[in-house]
Amino acid sequence: MRTVLINGRVLTGDGLRDDVAVVLDGDRIADVVDTASALDAERVDLGGGTLLPGFIDTQVNGGGGVLFNDEPTVEGVAAIAAAHRRFGTTGFLPTLISDDLDVIDRAMRAVEAAIEQGVPGVLGIHIEGPYLSARRRGIHSLDRLRDLDEEGLALLTSLKRGRTLVTVAPEAAPPAMISRLAAAGVVVAIGHTNAGYDEARRALDAGATGVTHLFNAMSQLGNREPGVVGAALDDPNCWCGLIVDGRHVHDATLKIALRARPWTASCWSPTPCPRWA
């Protein structure tokens, strides 16, 4: 049975439009048509609301009263998914900050099980640490940080279902390790790092493809040393995460970054998600 969604602001390839209707065929979008030519079908009035595709969030530390580090279980993943689904997030990576290897292992197995059991929206896992710089650790516990070794490499490449995104500092994960992660299908991002421009470039050349929360917990753009920020903005193939909560990054800084790397350059914008989200 076909249904037509009318009287809404619909995001299309041409921006937000209020002169189109969305045609549904069962649970699938069949067409987007001019409102005037909408089919004779059951109509749902959106009341002037905005209709958007579901959001995909690559950095979700928790939600629904659950912090993933505290509850690396299928139940924890499901609670986080349900909490964020209410706000339009239909796909996400449960994100673990620096922790012991056994906790990382439990989290990865929980994500595998969640995908197997059909928990909606789970796309894989984001492992943010423990292979980070002590100088730029932020809230990550110093006693959890370590250099990437063979044991860690084996763990990070062990996910059987979904995608693995890891955030590493080049100081703790040298180019050879980054290359091996990338070769195994792991998406590697640079973050929580005090690396200079040249070291960051070597990491990108080795297989890192992005930067986690650009500007935060990393070396900054300077006149003689461009830092990680400069390396990220200078590389057209590097995606950039941004925390756009009005606190982590100044509005002017955000605008400058978006001018330097427009949306066509695949700039991601995850936001932090505390346990009470």
Predicted regions and their residues:
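Charged helix-capping and loop-helix junction motifs
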Residues: 74-75, 107-110, 149-151, 224-229
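Divalent metal-dependent hydrolysis catalytic cores, especially in the metallo-beta-lactamase
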Residues: 61-63, 78-107, 120-133, 160-171, ...
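Divalent metal-binding pocket/active-site signature
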Residues: 127, 134-150, 155-227
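Divalent metal-coordination and catalytic microenvironments
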Residues: 8, 22, 27, 48, ...
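Histidine-rich, glycine-flanked metal-binding segment
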Residues: 1-6, 10-52
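Active-site metal-binding loops of divalent metal-dependent hydrolases
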Residues: 60, 170-171, 193, 245, ...
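Active-site-adjacent C-terminal substructures of enzyme catalytic domains
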Residues: 199-277
